[in-house]
């Protein structure tokens, strides 16, 4: 989950870019310049910071790839995909705000997640402890293309990828692996993470029946539990996959007049809200009054 350092820095510069001014007549030339400076600075600082904080004490090696596609029942891959998607959506909005053309905003902004996360893979590739993951690179690209393709086709994100977390029952069995506090656990405890695909069926299929409000989405989730190790888990030996059906709120469809509040809500829009949920796992159906 080291790539999340990039996400936090990107969120930081996005907040600065979008909330710093509220010009009636925006200076797009200045906005473009400021955006590129902030983004370049965030990228450089993250690389230096990661190298000092994470890689410094490990041996270097020649660049190499690894195959970790069986680890954590692919939960880490869903993490890469969802993060790349969300950073791409923020990138599109930020480049639009800065005055770039529609196609430039979609392609350059949409690829921001892949660009930032791929830098981590390069550092991994030169580390003897890890290695560049082809699965991670593919997941990064798919997340970006999911954001880009929707923006090109619909000019909005009708189908959203989201994230939710609640500490798993086994998170305290190995605090070095799963984290010592709630922030660390939210990044490292794959057993407590759930990744969601959220959509409004009427909106996607253009039925215009008005049976459901535009802000109410159906949410289809994927998670896994009882994974005690990061060593290429085999689904036949350890861990159980979980599938969920729930509801969600599309914050983009809420009628919020306050621009500051709207921007802040959009910045945390990747979080799936607690809702009644049906879970299928171990061959059984379970109902949760509220699942997060």
Predicted region positions:
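Glycine- and acidic-residue-rich phosphate-binding/metal-coordinating active-site segment common to enzymes
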Residues: 134-192
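Transmembrane beta-strands of outer-membrane beta-barrel pores
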Residues: 165-169, 222-228, 251-253
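Residues on the lipid-exposed face of transmembrane beta-strands in outer-membrane beta-barrel proteins
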Residues: 145-146, 195-201, 245-251, 287-289
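Small-polar-interrupted transmembrane alpha-helices in polytopic inner-membrane proteins
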Residues: 42-43, 105-125, 141-144
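N-terminal targeting leaders of membrane proteins
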Residues: 4-77, 81-100, 157, 207-213, ...
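Transmembrane beta-strands of outer-membrane beta-barrel proteins
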Residues: 112, 116, 159-161, 214-220, ...
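A conserved mid-domain beta-alpha-beta active-site/ligand-binding segment of alpha/beta enzyme cores
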Residues: 175-225
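Alpha-helical transmembrane segments that form the membrane-embedded catalytic/substrate-binding core
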Residues: 80-87, 124-151, 243-244
């Amino acid at each position: 989950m080291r790539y999340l350092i990039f996400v936090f820095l990107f969120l930081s510069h996005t907040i600065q870019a979008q909330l710093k001014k509220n010009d009636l007549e925006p200076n797009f030339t200045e906005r473009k310049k400021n955006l590129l400076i902030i983004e370049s600075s965030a990228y450089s600082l993250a690389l230096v910071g990661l190298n000092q904080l994470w890689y410094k004490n490990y041996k270097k090696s020649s660049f190499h790839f690894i195959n970790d596609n069986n680890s954590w029942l692919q939960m880490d891959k869903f993490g890469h995909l969802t993060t790349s998607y969300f950073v791409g959506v923020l990138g599109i909005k930020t480049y639009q705000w800065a005055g770039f053309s529609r196609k430039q905003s979609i392609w350059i902004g949409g690829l921001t997640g892949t660009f930032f996360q791929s830098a981590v893979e390069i550092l991994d590739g030169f580390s003897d402890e890890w290695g560049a993951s082809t699965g991670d690179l593919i997941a990064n690209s798919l997340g970006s293309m999911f954001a880009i393709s929707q923006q090109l086709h619909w000019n909005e994100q009708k189908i959203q990828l989201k994230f939710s977390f609640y500490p798993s029952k086994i998170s305290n069995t190995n605090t070095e692996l799963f984290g010592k506090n709630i922030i660390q656990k939210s990044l490292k405890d794959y057993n407590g993470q759930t990744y969601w695909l959220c959509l409004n069926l009427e909106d996607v299929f253009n039925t215009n029946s008005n049976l459901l409000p535009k802000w109410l989405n159906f949410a289809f989730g994927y998670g896994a539990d009882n994974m005690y190790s990061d060593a290429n888990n085999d689904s036949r030996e350890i861990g159980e996959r979980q599938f969920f059906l729930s509801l969600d709120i599309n914050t983009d469809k809420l009628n919020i007049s306050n621009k500051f509040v709207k921007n802040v809500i959009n910045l945390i829009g990747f979080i799936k809200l607690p809702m009644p949920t049906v879970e299928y796992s171990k061959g059984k159906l379970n109902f949760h009054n509220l699942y997060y």
